[in-house]
């Protein structure tokens, strides 16, 4: 009986130790091709996460809709089919038209105007995203 408990405790310790040191891998769904700046930014983000986590978390990017097409990314992440994804906010306009505010033509004609629009719309945008 003592031997069984001893072996069981060693097994549990090994299991916990192995699990705590295991690197985690996430798949990141991207709608745009690898050379697009959205995908390039995501690739840089993935590299930074891996570096900053000491390799404990690796994000594998899947550009060009190879994991999920653009219109499917939000649902895939929301339902846990993908751990992470990138899609610009205005693509969620069917969920809430407010999320298209930064894509409306002539609403902001400079980076300064875009920042003002962002600051003015941020509280409502956060509420809209939280409601999804």
What is the predicted function of each stretch?
Residues 8-16:
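Bacterial N-terminal signal peptides
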Residues 27-44, 64-69:
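Extracytoplasmic "Venus flytrap"
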Residues 1-8:
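Bacterial N-terminal signal peptides that target proteins for export
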Residues 48-79:
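N-terminal, post-signal-peptide region of Sec/Tat-exported proteins
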Residues 46-47, 88-132:
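Contiguous mixed-secondary-structure segments that line small-molecule binding/active-site clefts
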Residues 35-60, 120-124:
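Short, polar/charged alpha-helical segment
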Residues 16-22:
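Sec/Tat signal peptide C-region and signal peptidase I cleavage site
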Residues 63, 70, 80-93, 120-121:
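Beta->alpha turn/N-cap motifs
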């Amino acid at each position: 009986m003592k031997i069984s408990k001893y072996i069981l405790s060693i097994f549990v310790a090994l299991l916990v130790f192995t699990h705590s040191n295991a690197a985690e891998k996430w798949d990141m769904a991207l709608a745009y091709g690898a050379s697009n700046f959205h995908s390039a930014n995501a690739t840089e983000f993935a590299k930074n996460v891996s570096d900053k986590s000491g390799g404990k978390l690796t994000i594998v990017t899947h550009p060009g809709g190879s994991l999920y097409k653009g219109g499917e990314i939000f649902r895939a992440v929301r339902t846990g089919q993908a751990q992470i994804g990138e899609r610009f906010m205005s693509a969620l306009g069917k969920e809430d038209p407010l999320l298209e505010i930064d894509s409306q033509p002539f609403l902001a004609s400079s980076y300064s105007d875009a920042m003002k629009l962002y600051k003015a719309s941020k509280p409502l945008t956060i509420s809209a995203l939280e409601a999804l």
